[in-house]
């Protein structure tokens, strides 16, 4: 396997959502049923995440993500949920573009996707491993390793060891 690129997992909300960012425990609490990263009780409304703007405190949270056949799903489960289990009410989609489209179409939506997709209609949230030291998924933060949810992508070559490429 040869590393050829870097991908980042991003968390997106509808573009009208006033949420400023999330830390690892909040992300775990939103998406996980087991909360192995230390997330508190699962938030049911945006008010549970301290959104106090008019009209947001009582709004329910609608969750979107990738299906289990996806490497993005596995990476999210490993890194964002500390290998915990996803909630059953996370809508599963076959591609990151579909997740982004679902979040863009739901005022209450939150989802995770690969950063490499067109992110129209959504807001990308800065994320933090600790409390609120949020880091945006800029190209520089991803490349430098500062952004906490980045990973290398590999190309695999199937050839006999004693044969040239």
Model-derived segments and spans:
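Flexible loop/hinge segments at secondary-structure junctions
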Residues: 1-165
């Amino acid at each position: 396997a040869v590393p050829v690129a870097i991908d980042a997992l991003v968390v997106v909300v509808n573009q009208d959502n006033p949420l400023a960012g999330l830390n690892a425990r909040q992300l775990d609490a939103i998406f996980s049923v087991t909360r192995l990263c230390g997330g508190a009780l699962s938030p049911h409304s945006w008010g549970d995440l301290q959104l106090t703007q008019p009209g947001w405190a009582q709004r329910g949270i609608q969750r979107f993500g990738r299906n289990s056949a996806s490497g993005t799903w596995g990476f999210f489960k490993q890194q964002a949920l500390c290998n915990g289990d996803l909630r059953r009410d996370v809508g599963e989609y076959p591609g990151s573009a579909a997740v982004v489209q679902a979040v863009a179409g739901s005022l209450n939506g939150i989802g995770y996707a690969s950063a490499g997709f067109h992110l129209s209609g959504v807001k990308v949230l800065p994320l933090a491993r600790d409390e609120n030291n949020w880091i945006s998924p800029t190209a520089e933060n991803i490349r430098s390793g500062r952004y906490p949810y980045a990973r290398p992508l590999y190309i695999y070559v199937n050839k006999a060891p004693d044969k040239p490429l």
